[in-house]
Amino acid sequence: MDYQTIPSQGLSGEICVPGDKSISQRAVLLAAIAEGQTQVDGFLMGADNLAMVSALQQMGASIQVIEDENILVVEGVGMTGLQAPPEALDCGNSGTAIRLLSGLLAGQPFNTVLTGDSSLQRRPMKRIIDPLTLMGAKIDSTGNVPPLKIYGNPRLTGIHYQLPMASAQVKSCLLLAGLYARGKTCITEPAPSRDHTERLLKHFHYTLQKDKQSICVSGGGKLKANDISIPGDISSAAFFIVAATITPGSAIRLCRVGVNPTRLGVINLLKMMGADIEVTHYTEKNEEPTADITVRHARLKGIDIPPDQVPLTIDEFPVLLIAAAVAQGKTVLRDAAELRVKETDRIAAMVDGLQKLGIAAESLPDGVIIQGGTLEGGEVNSYDDHRIAMAFAVAGTLAKGSVRIRNCDNVKTSFPNFVELANEVGMNVKGVRGRGGF
């Protein structure tokens, strides 16, 4: 399926974006190995998260999916209750699922194969294979990409590990393995990354130690069931935040969005560029802060993106670069080589698309230089990447003509009702097949 957009006359209204994808995946995994029943409200029913649910079910976890209410009811099997799955576990398009499950499965008393779609089978896994091997795991792969064959070892040993890059997925993988290891596992990061796993471990009553740069867990503990309500995903909210910011006449409100400080890079950077964003009704529930976000149109200026904001914005850069494309002046992003190993090479995909829409964009090995200008209509390719697809749908709100975005089926992995909500606030996005359009 493709997207077809026409320019918007302005965004308005109030919407609630779906539950946070990262928190949803971690919550159901920890609930599955906890003792007792956990109800997960606000679970994101996207394809990536449902792949995680399916994998856990295949290992014996009882998970009732109430899809129309975004609720899961999980009967935890305890730390040692998982069983060998009957076949390979398919993680679909989800890098989070395969890396979290690798950590969980490294310490089990059975062997497992983890695989995924063609995109996932290109994603780098050496970053988890190496430290898990240091803990005593044995993992076979060809070229350090999926499929992964994990030979479970219930006698893992805790390690002290310095992450070569700020990566919440790698950190979380090792923390999960550390739950099953003898002794203490400590992970030190070069810069803060999202800390949902740490917050959820605390929510499920698992003791951990944390300082400014390191997090430690000791093996042998237990997780206790605890109901949880998932906040709205700020990565999904970011598309509407940018769309309202760049489109004249816009004013929207996004309700109950997760505002975890390790995820606020997109708001921090947009404010540096001159955005009019107000965060109100701040509350904290289930260890995660939540707030309403009000956004009004504003004129933006280009900036040099500070390196310390890169890990806090890593999933939002595709749509942030749309903001940069219409800002006055030049925006420079560096220290973001991680964007090249996402669902697609997001640096190359964004530069290609922006150039096709008339924007001067230059690719760097670890980033991009964008000279703000005027977005023209045209046709771009999402390269089967959900965030690229939605980012260019946002570009279509301000472009001088219609924008066609190719290959948008993967939006269902993270935001199944994106088109519905986009049109509700006035973005003018239509899903089309063949050569159809508005």
UniProtKB/Swiss-Prot annotation:
A single GO cellular-component term on record: cytoplasm
PROSITE patterns: EPSP_SYNTHASE_1, EPSP_SYNTHASE_2
Record key words, sorted: Amino-acid biosynthesis, Aromatic amino acid biosynthesis, Cytoplasm, Transferase
Pathway: Metabolic intermediate biosynthesis; chorismate biosynthesis; chorismate from D-erythrose 4-phosphate and phosphoenolpyruvate: step 6/7
Annotated EC: 2.5.1.19
Top EC class of this enzyme: transferase
Positions of phosphoenolpyruvate binding: 21, 95, 123, 169, 346, 387
Record's function text: Catalyzes the transfer of the enolpyruvyl moiety of phosphoenolpyruvate (PEP) to the 5-hydroxyl of shikimate-3-phosphate (S3P) to produce enolpyruvyl shikimate-3-phosphate and inorganic phosphate.
Subunit structure of this chain's protein: Monomer.
Protein name from the UniProt record: 3-phosphoshikimate 1-carboxyvinyltransferase
